[in-house]
C-alpha cells in the first residue's frame, strides 16, 4: 500500500467497515465486545467463535448513537487494522496515513473532539476528513449497482441512468434515509452539505427490532430474552416488510409462515431456516413464525404497535421535507437515497416509496435509489468514491493544521455541525 492512499473507515454503531479507497469491498468487523456465560470475553469478530451463544452480553463503544468510549473503540480498531491473519492486511500503524472517517450526525462537540484527538495524537494520522455518512452519499449515486424505485411507475422498479453535469463530481440534492442499528436518520443534503434544520431522527433501528422480536417470541413461543445473537439471526434471516400494506401481509400470513430450527449445539450453533425438502435432525426444536415475520418491522411505520407514542418513518420523512425551502421539496422527494442495514429487509424500500407517494401532493413523484447489494456497505462505498475527488484533498485537515490551530478549531470550523445550523 502506498502512503498516499486514503484509509476509509465507516465506524458504525454495529459494524466497522474499513479498507483502502481503491478497494471494491471493505472488510467488516463487529463493533462490540462480548462476554459469554462462562465469563470469557470476545472482541469484535471473535464473537463468531462462540459455541454456546446463549446469555451472551454485549458492550458497545456507542451509546444512543454517540461514540462515548474510545477506550473500547481503540481496542476494536487495533484488532481490525493490525490483524493480518484475519483480514489479510498489515498496515503496521496509521502514522502518516490519510483517513476518511464517518461519524454520527449531530455528534456532541466534546465527543467529536475526542475523535480528533485520538486520530491525530494517538494514531498520528497525516490527515483526517470526517462527516456523517449521509454527507458522502452524493458521490455514490452515480454507481452502476443502484436501482431506482418510483412511486408512480407501473413496474415499481426502474433502471435510470444518472446524468450529472460535466465537471461535477456529485449530485446536488439528495434526501438520505440512513436506517442503522441505533436509529434511523433522515438527512437532506444540499450542494454536498447536510441541511441541519431539516434533519430528523427516528428512534427505531436494528436494536429496537431485536428487542421487539425478543418480546414477541418470548410471549408466544420460547423465552429468548437473553438470546441476543439468536434473535439477531432470526431477524436477518426471517423478517420482511410487505411491499403493499400490513393488511395484505396479514391476509397471506398462512402462506408465508416459516420454520426456524433452533441451535442444538451439535449440528448447528446459530440456527437456520428449515428447508422443507431436508430431513430434520433428531430432537430438533422448531420455531414457527407467521405474522411475527412482518409485524415486527411494521414498527417502522406504526411504532404504536410497540407501545411507542412517536411518529413513524413516513411522518418523519414528511416532516423533514416540509422543513426545507418550498422549491426544494418536490426535488428532494424524487431524490431519496436509502442506506443502512435495515434496508436489507425485503420489501422495505418498496413499501416506503409506496406509502410516501400516497402522502405527497399528486403532482410530485417519489423516487428512491438503493444499492442492489448489501445496503449496509453503501456508506463505505460512497466514502471510497469521495476519497478520489479533488474536493476531498481540499477539505481534509492535515496534521500541521491540527497542531497549528488546535482542537477547538477542527470541531468548530471544519468538522462541527454548529456552523451550518
Swiss-Prot record:
<protein>
    <recommendedName>
        <fullName>Actin-like protein ARP6</fullName>
    </recommendedName>
</protein>
<dbReference type="InterPro" id="IPR004000">
    <property type="entry name" value="Actin"/>
</dbReference>
<comment type="function">
    <text>Component of the SWR1 complex which mediates the ATP-dependent exchange of histone H2A for the H2A variant HZT1 leading to transcriptional regulation of selected genes by chromatin remodeling. Involved in chromosome stability.</text>
</comment>
<keyword id="KW-0156">Chromatin regulator</keyword>
<dbReference type="GO" id="GO:0034399">
    <property type="term" value="C:nuclear periphery"/>
</dbReference>
<dbReference type="GO" id="GO:0031491">
    <property type="term" value="F:nucleosome binding"/>
</dbReference>
<keyword id="KW-0804">Transcription</keyword>
<keyword id="KW-0010">Activator</keyword>
<dbReference type="GO" id="GO:0000812">
    <property type="term" value="C:Swr1 complex"/>
</dbReference>
<comment type="subunit">
    <text>Component of the SWR1 chromatin remodeling complex.</text>
</comment>
<keyword id="KW-0206">Cytoskeleton</keyword>
<dbReference type="GO" id="GO:0005737">
    <property type="term" value="C:cytoplasm"/>
</dbReference>
<keyword id="KW-0539">Nucleus</keyword>
<keyword id="KW-0805">Transcription regulation</keyword>
<dbReference type="InterPro" id="IPR043129">
    <property type="entry name" value="ATPase_NBD"/>
</dbReference>
<dbReference type="GO" id="GO:0005856">
    <property type="term" value="C:cytoskeleton"/>
</dbReference>
<dbReference type="Pfam" id="PF00022">
    <property type="entry name" value="Actin"/>
</dbReference>
<keyword id="KW-0963">Cytoplasm</keyword>
<comment type="similarity">
    <text>Belongs to the actin family. ARP6 subfamily.</text>
</comment>
<dbReference type="GO" id="GO:0006338">
    <property type="term" value="P:chromatin remodeling"/>
</dbReference>
Amino acid at each position: 500500500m502506498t502512503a498516499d492512499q486514503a484509509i476509509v473507515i465507516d465506524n458504525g454503531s454495529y459494524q466497522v467497515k474499513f479498507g483502502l479507497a481503491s478497494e471494491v469491498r471493505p472488510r467488516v468487523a463487529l463493533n462490540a465486545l462480548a462476554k459469554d456465560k462462562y465469563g470469557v470475553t470476545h472482541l469484535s469478530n471473535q464473537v463468531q467463535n462462540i459455541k454456546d451463544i446463549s446469555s451472551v452480553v454485549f458492550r458497545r463503544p456507542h451509546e444512543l448513537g454517540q461514540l462515548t468510549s474510545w477506550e473500547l473503540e481503540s481496542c476494536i480498531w487495533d484488532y481490525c487494522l493490525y490483524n493480518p491473519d484475519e483480514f489479510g492486511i498489515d498496515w503496521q500503524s496509521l502514522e502518516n496515513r490519510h483517513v476518511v472517517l464517518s461519524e454520527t450526525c449531530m455528534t456532541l462537540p466534546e465527543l467529536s473532539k475526542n475523535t480528533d484527538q485520538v486520530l491525530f495524537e494517538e494514531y498520528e494520522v497525516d490527515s483526517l476528513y470526517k462527516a456523517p455518512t449521509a454527507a458522502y452519499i452524493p458521490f455514490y449515486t452515480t454507481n452502476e449497482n443502484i436501482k431506482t424505485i418510483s412511486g408512480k411507475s407501473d413496474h415499481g422498479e426502474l433502471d435510470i441512468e444518472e446524468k450529472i453535469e460535466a465537471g461535477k463530481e456529485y449530485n446536488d440534492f439528495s434526501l438520505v434515509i440512513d436506517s442503522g442499528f441505533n436509529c434511523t436518520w433522515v438527512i437532506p443534503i444540499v450542494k454536498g452539505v447536510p441541511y441541519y434544520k431539516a434533519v430528523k431522527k427516528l428512534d427505531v433501528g436494528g436494536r429496537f427490532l431485536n428487542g421487539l422480536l425478543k418480546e414477541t417470541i418470548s410471549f408466544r413461543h420460547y423465552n429468548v430474552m437473553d438470546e441476543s445473537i439468536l434473535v439477531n439471526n432470526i431477524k436477518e434471516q426471517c423478517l420482511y416488510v410487505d411491499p403493499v400494506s400490513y393488511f395484505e401481509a396479514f391476509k397471506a400470513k398462512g402462506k408465508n409462515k416459516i420454520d426456524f430450527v433452533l441451535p442444538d449445539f451439535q449440528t448447528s450453533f446459530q440456527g437456520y431456516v428449515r428447508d422443507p425438502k431436508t430431513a430434520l435432525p433428531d430432537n430438533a426444536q422448531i420455531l414457527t413464525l407467521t405474522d411475527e415475520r412482518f409485524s415486527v418491522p411494521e414498527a417502522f411505520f406504526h411504532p404504536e404497535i410497540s407501545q411507542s407514542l412517536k411518529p413513524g418513518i413516513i411522518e418523519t420523512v414528511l416532516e423533514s421535507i416540509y422543513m426545507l425551502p418550498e422549491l426544494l421539496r418536490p426535488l428532494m422527494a424524487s431524490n431519496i437515497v436509502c442506506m443502512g442495514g435495515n434496508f436489507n429487509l425485503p420489501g422495505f424500500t418498496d413499501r416506503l416509496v409506496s406509502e410516501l407517494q400516497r402522502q405527497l401532493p399528486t403532482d410530485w413523484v417519489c423516487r428512491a435509489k438503493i444499492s442492489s447489494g448489501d445496503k449496509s456497505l453503501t456508506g463505505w462505498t460512497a466514502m471510497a468514491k469521495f476519497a478520489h475527488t479533488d474536493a476531498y484533498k481540499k477539505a481534509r485537515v492535515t496534521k500541521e493544521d491540527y497542531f497549528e490551530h488546535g482542537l477547538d478549531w477542527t470541531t468548530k470550523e471544519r468538522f462541527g455541525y454548529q456552523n451550518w445550523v
